[in-house]
């Protein structure tokens, strides 16, 4: 029973961590709209991206995430909107997040723009203890499957010039909690904040994109990650990233005709005592349609370095 209790505690510890920040920082910096709704006003036309990440791939029920992100910048209206759907699974735990993002876009000068964003959605948490092979179900927690829906309201600010960008956001400002029928608190939401800054420069046919992303959660040490991406024209990209004390990783992306981009990335844990099974793999595919143009263009990330694809 002590081993069983420890296993359940481990599951819940991971669940709470994922509930507090659905994705890893590497996944966040690849998907800015997941933490900053103001970003949806940056892209042009219609943008669609699919994203998949998995961890501990040799274990049944290992953590995995699937996300679909859609953004549309309406012509000549300074308004953009989008929707993102994120599904997290880890063994008996499932977290479904559905967000709508809205932004108002302004130009303060010819080269500098900024956006104000609002995020609204729901987060659904559920567990299925019946799928566990538990011999002794006498403890109440084993008899209570959890199914809760909590609201999500977030805000964000994003500004950029030709070769730099800066963003500040909070993806959920509502404090809420998840409890069992016996009033045991399993999860209490604490506001989290994100800050990002990037500076980019060209060297012949290469674009170097450098980004810093920090995540601040009350009562938890600040998490931050550094990344550098090199894009050769708009044919191929290679990026490296480092999160101190936690992970090192990289990603390669290929730009295809028809404004398609396919990427594969991997993270390797730097934590002492963590095995190779903690490696994280991710795949993504995206495409973009530019309105008012007869031909699609796959050059936006190279020509506009504040864009993340």
Regions found by a protein language model. Give the residues of each.
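Sec/Tat signal peptide C-region and signal peptidase I cleavage site
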Residues: 15-19
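Subset of outer-membrane beta-barrel
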Residues: 20-309
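Sec-dependent signal peptide recognition
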Residues: 2-9
